[in-house]
């Protein structure tokens, strides 16, 4: 059976492609004909294509685990002596496997969306699935035609070429899946926005759904970027955590637009303002997620992460990016309506601060985008070769970063009557992140020198003593490991063990840094080439605060896990808001008020009530506004009007009738 497994995997890819081509047809037909059965068939199609992709990915993973070197992709990226963890990481260690992983995770997001809303009849949901299915079909077409991971080689290779040594690190087991998980969640949010355009309206309820899927996608992308930064710090031996590499920037760009999107959606879902901001940022996030794939997979930009330049793949990748981007922008231009109510902002209102945040994020995004692509544009224009590195990005983005910190402080302390715990957690993470950057940059000290066993050097008050060199042989490599003792005022506080590894299969040498840390300080050692008899080159670093950078990132992610509460400085206002919310009905629920329901529209309306209470509006004004917008149905207590006179008069009439009956009975006696 194992003989035909790769063919089974490829067949599953073909079937999934076919399902994704047919699924949008059922969605559009169901919406147009208002046929619920066709809409449910759309959900079934999404679940079926996910099952097929899961089968294909499972087959590829099994081929790696059993070292099936008859598959070219396995032979190029695996080795029989690799541990099973590294064999698993090798599945997405090359172009074909990583692209299949991305498609699988996007498919998983789509299946989760389909399952979650399988009972809904609103056209928004099948239209969202149709948009997702179209993107999956386009990506699968590229996989089948230009990136098939199941291509055979005959006769089979005797041994594999091994996984790239740079990728043989725990961080790389989780870094790519988290990035692709983030891209997938953000693409679902963008698909909701595009589906709302197809439906004809992007309102607060749509924004709430969009926000609900963008937030976990943003969290996964943030975690992936943090993990990638940690990998670069631990693996590349430069003592830094961010190098403004084109592929690093490729993941930063959608993160910037997604962060701006979340801020914009926070107002759209509550007050239905900034609609165009939210729609455009959702589309831009989709485009930048695709652009990142184009940069990494085509090799058009020089990077330590990118794959080799491949014109055969670059052209269809660019065509795919252009097709989806232009179609999304064209849909926005065709279907976008007015931007909602006209609202005037005061000088330091929440709305004005969020607008400033959006402008700052867009400015940084534009700087990073132009700086990343400019060397390629420079070369295409025939002007020669140009390098745009860290000095440019640091100087160009610094003033905008400082302004962001000012806005965060203002948003935290000048927001007035309401304070949201998730925002406080996220902004605390940003401040800790900024503190880590400043402290690590100011405190960093380094030295490069040659040492023999027994020699020592003092740096930043700490003594590094090269004690001995150990030789080791492990699975797929041999290594020379230096034992460097670390002293603080003559007291031994630990050891550093930098290595030089040689990977036989690839005939490649790698330097493995060694790091010791205590929460505040980092001690970092890299062993270089042999420069004489028992003499080796070393680079040593001491710096503080670098862990705060990743801690700040984790706090930002924790923001997504905090219960979305709303606290008021005035307890009376909080009680008033809860009282009003309890009097309003969720329009889509079975007899639940806004406090009892967690439906997207109910949460959006609840936040609207809280916002209006915080602005000083009274109960009559808020209930009147809700009634005008949603109709009398939204009120648990129907208003006293001519149409409801019978309803309200009935209890009074019955009481009078009962009193009359009792009086007559008593009179007869």
What residues fall within each predicted segment?
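Extracytoplasmic/lumenal ectodomains and periplasmic regions of secretory and membrane proteins
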Residues: 491-530, 572-624
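Residue-level signature of catalytic and energy-coupling elements of molecular machines
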Residues: 461, 538, 586, 622, ...
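Short N-terminal segments immediately surrounding and downstream of signal-peptide cleavage
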Residues: 561-577
């Amino acid at each position: 059976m194992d003989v035909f497994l790769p063919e089974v995997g490829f067949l599953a890819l073909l079937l999934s492609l076919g399902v994704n081509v047919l699924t949008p047809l059922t969605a559009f037909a169901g919406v147009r004909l208002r046929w619920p059965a066709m809409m449910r068939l759309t959900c079934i199609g999404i679940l079926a294509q996910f099952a097929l992709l899961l089968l294909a990915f499972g087959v590829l993973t099994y081929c790696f685990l059993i070292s099936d070197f008859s598959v070219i992709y396995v032979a190029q990226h695996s080795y029989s002596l690799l541990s099973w963890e590294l064999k698993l990481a090798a599945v997405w260690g090359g172009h074909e496997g990583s692209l299949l992983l991305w498609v699988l995770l996007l498919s998983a997001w789509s299946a989760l969306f389909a399952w979650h809303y399988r009972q809904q009849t609103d056209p928004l949901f099948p239209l969202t699935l149709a948009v997702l299915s179209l993107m999956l079909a386009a990506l699968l077409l590229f996989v089948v035609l230009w990136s098939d991971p199941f291509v055979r080689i005959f006769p089979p290779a005797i041994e594999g070429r091994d996984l790239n040594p740079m990728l043989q690190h725990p961080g790389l087991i989780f870094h790519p899946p988290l990035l692709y998980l983030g891209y997938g969640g953000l693409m679902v949010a963008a698909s909701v926005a595009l589906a709302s355009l197809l439906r004809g309206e992007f309102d607060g309820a749509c924004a709430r759904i969009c926000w609900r899927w963008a937030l976990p996608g943003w969290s996964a992308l943030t975690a992936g970027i943090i993990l990638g930064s940690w990998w670069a710090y631990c693996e590349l031996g430069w003592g830094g955590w961010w190098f403004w590499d084109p592929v690093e920037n490729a993941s930063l760009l959608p993160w910037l637009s997604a962060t701006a999107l979340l801020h914009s959606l926070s107002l759209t879902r509550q007050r239905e303002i900034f609609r165009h901001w939210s729609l455009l940022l959702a589309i831009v996030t989709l485009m930048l997620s695709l652009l990142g794939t184009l940069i990494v997979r085509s090799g058009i930009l020089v990077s330590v992460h990118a794959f080799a330049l491949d014109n055969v793949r670059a052209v269809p990748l660019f065509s795919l990016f252009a097709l989806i981007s232009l179609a999304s922008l064209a849909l926005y231009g065709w279907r976008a309506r007015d931007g909602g109510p006209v609202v005037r902002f005061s000088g330091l209102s929440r709305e004005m601060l969020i607008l400033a945040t959006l402008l700052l994020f867009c400015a940084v995004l534009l700087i990073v985008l132009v700086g990343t692509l400019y060397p390629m544009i420079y070369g295409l224009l025939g002007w020669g070769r140009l390098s745009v590195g860290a000095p440019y990005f640091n100087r160009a983005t610094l003033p905008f970063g400082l302004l962001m910190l000012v806005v965060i402080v203002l948003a935290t302390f000048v927001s007035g009557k309401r304070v949201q715990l998730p925002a406080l957690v996220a902004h605390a993470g940003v401040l800790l992140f900024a503190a880590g950057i400043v402290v690590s940059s100011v405190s960093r000290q380094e030295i490069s020198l040659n040492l023999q066993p027994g020699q020592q050097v003092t740096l930043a008050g700490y003594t590094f003593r090269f004690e001995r060199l150990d030789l080791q042989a492990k699975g797929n490599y041999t290594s020379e490991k230096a034992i460097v003792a670390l002293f603080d005022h003559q007291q031994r506080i630990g050891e550093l063990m930098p290595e030089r590894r040689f990977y036989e299969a690839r005939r490649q040498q790698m330097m493995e840094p060694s790091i010791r840390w205590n929460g505040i300080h980092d001690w970092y050692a890299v062993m270089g080439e042999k420069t004489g008899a028992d003499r080796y080159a070393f680079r040593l670093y001491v710096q503080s605060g670098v862990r705060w950078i990743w801690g700040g990132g984790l706090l930002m992610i924790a923001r997504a896990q905090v219960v979305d509460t709303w606290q008021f400085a005035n307890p009376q206002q909080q009680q008033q808001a809860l009282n009003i919310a309890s009097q309003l009905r969720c329009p889509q629920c079975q007899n639940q008020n806004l406090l009892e329901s967690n439906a997207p529209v109910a949460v959006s309306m609840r936040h609207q009530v809280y916002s209006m209470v915080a602005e000083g509006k009274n109960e009559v004004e808020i209930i009147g506004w809700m009634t005008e917008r949603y109709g009398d149905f939204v009120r648990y207590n129907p208003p006293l009007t001519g149409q409801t006179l019978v309803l309200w008069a009935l209890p009074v009439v019955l009481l009078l009738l009962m009193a009359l009956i009792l009086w007559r009975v008593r009179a007869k006696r």
